[in-house]
């Protein structure tokens, strides 16, 4: 059955794309950032209501973690993630694959899937394409990611090739299982979408061939996975540029796990629509805050008596109400409020960076914006 997803390309400047992505939970203006709420909340004490207040469009939750705790069946009994978290916008759930390959211990990979030990208590779990789709059906997310093998970088070409082929076979099983779950009325969200994931490590030939194969499956969207895992930034950009011509023009494109503001600007420049990253919240929890002039460490002594907001150009609750000096004090005193305000600020910055990118694309001035800010925003000041 052909995909009914409505990604609409509104405008293009070179390879950069301005678009809309319509889902059952609302329309996403793209390019867009997905805010990582691993266990259904942003680390640092932010709720779904906070995400609404900072202008977020999409929330991303973690299939692996929610399967382990509180359990996807409990979430289904509570009406799905939207009712459980009180977030009514689009939610993307990852497949669990990345966590299985990065967190879990003693894993064993077969054609059927992966057997691994929980990082919480060590109990044995099996997850394959069907199990991942069943868990995500219980979660009821707007977008489910296909279950894929995440290969460590660097990797051998032969193993990477075999892994891509297995990921394609798993993708076909994901598609079939999602169709079954919908047909039998099992999915919490009968309009759940499926995204496939391009793999191939840093081998351009594997990346391109794999993208050609999965593009033929007519999925709702396509992601580039397995990057931003230690390879040089220039290599990541090159992989995006190599794959982009083979990504369907009428489908949304998602770069997984990326990244810094500069990374995002560069990837938009290369034709990517959708992003996610733990970086803004993780950095904020350590006092590293994004501004339009670069990155500041709010714990530095030079901010002890600084009466200015974190960023005078920012409209977030932290910048509207508090000084750098006060937020620095909260960090030094180890008050939870300091972390919460910092996380709120960085996520506001990321979401409004995307809004600024969309405005520049609308105006036809994105290339000039790219040239001005791509290095500046990642500079530590």
Predicted regions, residues:
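Glycine-rich phosphate/ribose-binding loops and adjacent secondary-structure elements
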Residues: 165, 177, 181-183, 189-310
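Short acidic/polar active-site loop segments enriched in Thr and Asp
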Residues: 57, 142, 220, 273, ...
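C-terminal extensions of enzymes
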Residues: 1-20, 28-37, 44-45, 148-154, ...
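Conserved, mostly hydrophobic/aromatic
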Residues: 26, 59, 94, 136, ...
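Non-catalytic, usually N-terminal nucleic-acid engagement modules in DNA/RNA processing proteins
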Residues: 1-188, 301-304
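Structural signal for hydrophobic packing residues in well-ordered secondary-structure cores
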Residues: 140, 171, 175-178, 182, ...
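Glycine- and acidic
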Residues: 153-156, 161, 221-227, 336-339
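A non-catalytic, amphipathic alpha-helix used as a structural packing/dimerization or gating element
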Residues: 131, 135, 162-173, 209, ...
């Amino acid at each position: 059955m052909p995909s009914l997803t409505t990604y609409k390309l509104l405008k293009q400047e070179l390879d950069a794309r301005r678009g809309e992505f319509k889902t059952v939970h609302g329309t996403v203006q793209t390019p867009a950032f997905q805010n990582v709420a691993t266990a259904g909340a942003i680390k640092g004490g932010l709720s779904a209501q906070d995400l609404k207040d900072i202008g977020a469009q999409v929330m991303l939750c973690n299939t692996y973690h929610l399967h382990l705790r509180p359990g996807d069946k409990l979430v289904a009994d509570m009406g799905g993630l939207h009712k459980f978290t009180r977030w009514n916008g689009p939610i993307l759930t990852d497949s669990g694959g990345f966590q299985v390959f990065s967190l879990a211990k003693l894993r064993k990979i077969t054609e059927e899937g992966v057997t691994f030990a929980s990082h919480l208590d060590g109990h044995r779990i099996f997850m394959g394409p069907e199990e991942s789709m069943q868990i995500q059906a219980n979660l009821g997310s707007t977008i489910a990611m296909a279950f894929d093998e995440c290969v460590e970088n660097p990797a051998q070409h032969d193993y990477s090739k075999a892994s891509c082929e297995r990921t394609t076979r798993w993708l076909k099983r994901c598609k079939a299982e999602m169709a079954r779950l919908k047909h039998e009325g099992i999915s919490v969200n009968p309009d759940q979408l499926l995204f496939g994931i391009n793999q191939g490590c840093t081998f351009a030939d594997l990346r391109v061939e794999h993208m050609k194969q999965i593009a033929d499956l007519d999925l709702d969207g396509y992601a580039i996975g397995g990057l931003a895992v230690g390879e040089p930034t220039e290599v990541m950009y090159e992989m995006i540029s190599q794959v982009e011509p083979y990504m369907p023009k009428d489908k949304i494109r998602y770069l997984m796990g990326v990244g810094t503001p500069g990374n995002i600007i560069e990837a938009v420049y290369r034709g990517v629509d959708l992003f996610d990253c733990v970086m803004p919240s993780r950095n904020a929890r350590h006092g590293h805050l994004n501004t339009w002039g670069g990155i500041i460490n709010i714990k530095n002594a030079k901010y002890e008596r600084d009466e200015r907001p974190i960023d005078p150009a920012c409209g977030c609750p932290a910048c509207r109400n508090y000084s750098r000096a006060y937020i620095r004090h909260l960090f030094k005193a180890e008050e939870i409020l300091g972390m919460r305000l910092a996380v709120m600020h960085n996520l506001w910055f990321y979401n409004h960076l995307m809004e600024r990118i969309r405005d520049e694309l609308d105006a036809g001035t994105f290339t000039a914006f790219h040239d001005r800010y791509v290095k500046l925003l990642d500079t530590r000041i």
